Amino acid sequence: MKFLFLFLAILLATEVPVISGKRHILRCMGNSGICRASCKKNEQPYLYCRNYQACCLQSYMRISISGKEENTDWSYEKQWPRLP
């Protein structure tokens, strides 16, 4: 009888809890975006994911269309022209 209780205790301790409502988040754009049915207010849709949902990126994300690395140093001196 003690063996049965020990077996049940071990079985219940190793059981993975089921969390309802939590789903695996599908990432896109090199883990920069999240696939959603509709993007949040501060996100922009970009292309589509494998499950035909929009790939939502934060509005501040910059996307390189050419595929080359761009200079992303946006310091004040490089952003505005110098005044004489």
From Swiss-Prot:
Expression (tissue specificity): Abundant expression in the male reproductive tract only. Expressed abundantly in testis, while expression in epididymis decreased gradually from caput to cauda.
Disulfide bonds: 28-55, 35-49, 39-56
Keywords: Antibiotic, Antimicrobial, Defensin, Disulfide bond, Secreted, Signal
Pfam hit, one: Defensin_big
Domain of life: Eukaryota
Annotated GO biological process: defense response to Gram-negative bacterium; defense response to Gram-positive bacterium
GO cellular component: extracellular region
Principal localisation: secreted
Subcellular location(s) per record: Secreted
Signal sequence, start to end: 1-21
Role this protein plays: Has antibacterial activity.
Similarity section: Belongs to the beta-defensin family.
Protein's name in the database: Beta-defensin 119
